[in-house]
Amino acid sequence: MTTDVISADLKTVLRRLKLGRMLDTLPERLVLARQQKMPHQDFLTLVLADEASRRDSLAVVLRVQRGHLDPALQLDAWDATAKVTFDRALLNELTTLRFLEAHAHVAIIGPVGVGKTFLAHALGHIACRRGRTVLAMRTDHMLKTLKHARLDNSYDAEVRKLLAVDLLILDDFALDTLDPTESRDLYEILTERHRAGSIIVTSNRGPDEWLITFADPLRAQSAIDRFTSNAYDLVIEGESYRQRLKPTLKSAAP
């Protein structure tokens, strides 16, 4: 099989146009074009489609990284034999991301270890693959970040980050009792994103227990009412899923 030599001039031009990665597949595409006597336009379409596909894949990787999503927590890695129960039809509906289109929210509720974070991140991965921006973080980490941001006058910038993404995932929501500043910050995020951007929360508590974690009952009632009135509740029950994620020793070869 004849291997086409890519000229130095072509390499230079491709790199100037930021198309240098096309060189990875260009030789084999040239061979294919010769074998199939491919018209020039079809060949150009083929190599540009390769580049578009590569850029799309890279964009997904970057969205996942910037969103702080766990690479291992994807729906195709979910253990279907796990002894947990939840509304599968609702999960299937959520994977369509129609809730994102409607700026609706999701509350994933259940005891410790049943896979709440797993499913939240799995939905985040689906969103990234479909071109949406995501940010996942623990609720306490978000509130600490906002508290520290007040000290260096970066508070407004941090809030903009939380409001700008298509999907905000808050893990361990309503886990701890909030002080007045934290209550106010959480109120701001929940109300500003109401019907403007979707939120997924994971929580060990049901929505009826969230109110007691806020320092300000009036703000709490307002924020929680906005959220719950526009949220799907995915309730998970059963044994700990987390044990299935434990590392295990592989059997040594005989």
PLM regions with names:
Residues A8, T12-R15, D24-P27, T45-L46, ...:
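Solvent-exposed alpha-helical segments within well-ordered globular domains of core cellular machineries
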Residues L73-T95:
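N-terminal pre-Walker A segment at the start of P-loop NTPase domains
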Residues L167:
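Walker B motif beta-strand of ABC-family P-loop ATPases
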Residues A89-A164, L211-T213:
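Conserved P-loop
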Residues M1-T12, P247-P254:
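Intrinsically disordered, low-complexity and often Lys/Arg-enriched segments
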Residues K11, L19-D70:
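Interdomain "pre-motor" coupling segment immediately N-terminal to P-loop NTPase/helicase cores
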